[in-house]
Amino acid sequence: MSSSLGKEKDCKEKDPKVSSAKEREKEAKASGGFGKESKDRETKTKGKEAKDGKKDSSSAQPGVAFSVDNTIKRPNPAPGARKKSSNAEVIKELNKCREENSVRLDLAKRSIHLLPSSIKELTQLTELYLYGNKLQSLPAEVGCLVNLETLALSENSLTSLPDSLGNLKQLRMVDLRHNKLREIPPVVYRLTSLTTLYLRFNRITSVEKDIKNLSNLTMLSIRENKIKQLPAEIGELCNLITLDVAHNQLEHLPKEIGNCTQITKLDLQHNELLDLPDTIGNLSTLKSLGLRYNRLSAIPRTLAQCSKLDELNLENNIISTLPEGLLSSLVNLTSLTLARNCFQSYPVGGPSQFSTIYALNMEHNRINKIPFGIFSRAKVLSKLNMKDNQLTSLPLDFGTWTSMVELNLATNQLNKIPEDVSGLVSLEVLVLSNNLLRNLPHGIGNLRKLRELDLEENKLESLPNEIAYLRDLQIP
């Protein structure tokens, strides 16, 4: 094979008319491609060429059955052929499911436009996956699948659901993400056994009072819609564990949210929230609270009652202070983000407020100093982001931050890094770009774990020789 390919290359580089028939025969024998029959075919081909007045390009290289130009191309399928083929495959899957009495049917990503009405025969189904198709509607016959527990319909073009779905009394999970719903289909409010409901990425503008019927819900995701308010009846979802209403247009939360005392995750980021109800303090099991990118100017004191909270994100609001002692009360808090607000100083509450914090982000505020001793109890603080503030110096106990792994001090007004930076022996990332530094302390050579050091946009004239000790430092 390799010999034949080599000859093909030769044929392209050299005019085949130059080579004699004898030479070509010799080459063909060397490649094992010629016998008497091949020679006869060559003679016939030459005769045909002479008759036609042109040379067949495929005969320029004996031993090669087809040239690239002569490859047979399949015609494009007639319009509708693919759709018919898809429908045939779907019917085949339905028949197979019925014959095998399967309880799970996966028809995802089959380019299905219309589900066959014969789906009604599969009454044994408990799981039906139809995501990633081109469905604009469902046949009423789906309502015959009375044992169905899981119905996955995401990534279609559904604008409504048939009322017959109300017959599905066993439904536990419905996934309607990425469709074209302008409202929560009325039949959904009748699916009282639902525990999980996904409605993300639709065009829904409101949640009706009938949401109270879904009292078994533990997970409700209605993020990335156009919802402007939640009804008071949301408070009747007493089993709710996760509520995701992010990326909507909410300005207020109903005070009844405080009745959802089982919630552990509440995501309200990217709304237009102006305030929070005091009843949020009733969410005693809350662990994660997302409030970034809203218009909050204050946080209620009652949040201190959410003692199990381990993640609090308040990025990009207009908050200038927190209630005194709030952070000290949140004894399980490990991640705190206060970036892009209006803080001019650290929250009031003393060192105890950071004793459990693992990651603190204060980026893009107006803070001009880090108080001495503020991290004296922060034994697990390993990530501190103070980028884009107004720091002119670092505290005298800077060298005691021995657990620090990532430290971002970029875009401040620092003109000096203390010599006791040598105490930050766990440091792996140090960002000092966009400051006023003219030199670095010799103690930086003690940061043997340092792998990233950003010094861009400073006034450095030289670097200490001790930089050479940083064996793990990665230079871009």
Report each predicted region and the residues it spans:
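Short, glycine/acidic-rich beta->alpha junctions
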Residues: 459
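The feature captures the LRR N-terminal capping module
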Residues: 1-431, 436-442, 449-452, 462-465, ...
